[in-house]
Amino acid sequence: MGETMSKRLKLHLGGEAEMEERAFVNPFPDYEAAAGALLASGAAEETGCVRPPATTDEPGLPFHQDGKIIHNFIRRIQTKIKDLLQQMEEGLKTADPHDCSAYTGWTGIALLYLQLYRVTCDQTYLLRSLDYVKRTLRNLNGRRVTFLCGDAGPLAVGAVIYHKLRSDCESQECVTKLLQLQRSVVCQESDLPDELLYGRAGYLYALLYLNTEIGPGTVCESAIKEVVNAIIESGKTLSREERKTERCPLLYQWHRKQYVGAAHGMAGIYYMLMQPAAKVDQETLTEMVKPSIDYVRHKKFRSGNYPSSLSNETDRLVHWCHGAPGVIHMLMQAYKVFKEEKYLKEAMECSDVIWQRGLLRKGYGICHGTAGNGYSFLSLYRLTQDKKYLYRACKFAEWCLDYGAHGCRIPDRPYSLFEGMAGAIHFLSDVLGPETSRFPAFELDSSKRD
């Protein structure tokens, strides 16, 4: 008891120093202060009263009243994207030729160019994407099965690119090869984990991605159901072993640790199970997934952040992979599925933590960097239409416009999608169209688009 108390006291006293070590102090005023200053400056001179500006724009803010990004900010982002793309292409000349993953390798670069094609409709980006994915499809090794770190990523992205190019034969070949991985995924005797980066949830994402991007029925419902059932059975088994069936019906671990976050933990797994495309039945969602989410919710720190694992009492990490920026996506999806205000309220609390502590010294990337944290604001804006979150996303984008100027650590794979420059470019391109933005290799399209 005494040890726990001293641990918590130490955490409380060391909180600010810890934050400064891991994140920069956010230099931007929050939306209320920025919008308030604009209202004050737009007050009528003759009466001295405060009123909104008479124009349809909100001068000084990076967007108009309808949420469309202003032309000047669009131009700044487009210029920076062009500049960063040149740097990235130069840097990739010395990248690991054998890394085919979406996380740190060539599939991630293919995904970036696919995104730029989506945003601009410029065919040259689609062809660039094809160049990169062809490179990966020649080097599949069969060792891993997930979208982010295994063969499922190159195959799923390849299928989508070929589909967009109307090369249906090549697209179907990729789908067929992807489905051949399924046997090893659903085998309960295998030591495959359930998490997103290396486990079943990561393979499930690949199947859902195909049905979202190419069309329903690309992967048959029975194949998806088989993977979903394997994930659920695995969670029930561990919950039983840990005697947590009542409190947390679906419990998961990775390397013997019960992680919480999006990358290796329960937030990422529950998030995938709640996707409409996964077609998990309502009874399972209500009886198994919902109480498990609530169990994780109760592990929240007083700050509003979440631990990296159930056994960790240290409030340190504010990353998509560990902490509030990953858990927020689970909470938003829970709000959509269960329609309970508590989930939205806690997602908003996560957003406040990310705003305060999300400009990371680790860099600008997606997994554990500022761009990944910025995506949480875009997602919350799409859900609520509250301009506060669009403003926050734009401010994190503004930070990324000064890429390299803050003295951040240089990641091991500095040009990759999840650790480096490609991820920041992806985020910046999504800020141009917030309504259709999505976190790559994680969020799925809720609308049909080609």
From Swiss-Prot:
Places the protein is found: Nucleus; Cytoplasm; Cell membrane
For this chain, the family text in UniProt reads: Belongs to the LanC-like protein family.
Q: What is this protein called?
A: LanC-like protein 2
What task does this protein carry out?
Necessary for abscisic acid (ABA) binding on the cell membrane and activation of the ABA signaling pathway in granulocytes.
Which keywords fit this entry according to its UniProt record?
Cell membrane, Cytoplasm, Lipoprotein, Membrane, Myristate, Nucleus, Phosphoprotein
**Changes after translation:** Myristoylated. Essential for membrane association.
Q: Where is the lipid attached (N-myristoyl glycine)?
A: 2
Lipid metabolism found in the keyword field: no
Among InterPro entries, the record links this protein to: 6hp_glycosidase-like_sf (IPR012341), LANC-like (IPR007822), LanC-like_prot_euk (IPR020464)
Q: In which tissues is it expressed?
A: Expressed in brain and testis.
User: Subunit composition?
Assistant: Interacts with an array of inositol phospholipids such as phosphatidylinositol 3-phosphate (PI3P), phosphatidylinositol 4-phosphate (PI4P) and phosphatidylinositol 5-phosphate (PI5P). PIP-binding enhances membrane association.
Q: Where is this region: Interaction with inositol phospholipids?
A: 2-15
Q: What is one GO cellular-component annotation here? A: plasma membrane
Q: Which domain of life is it from?
A: Eukaryota
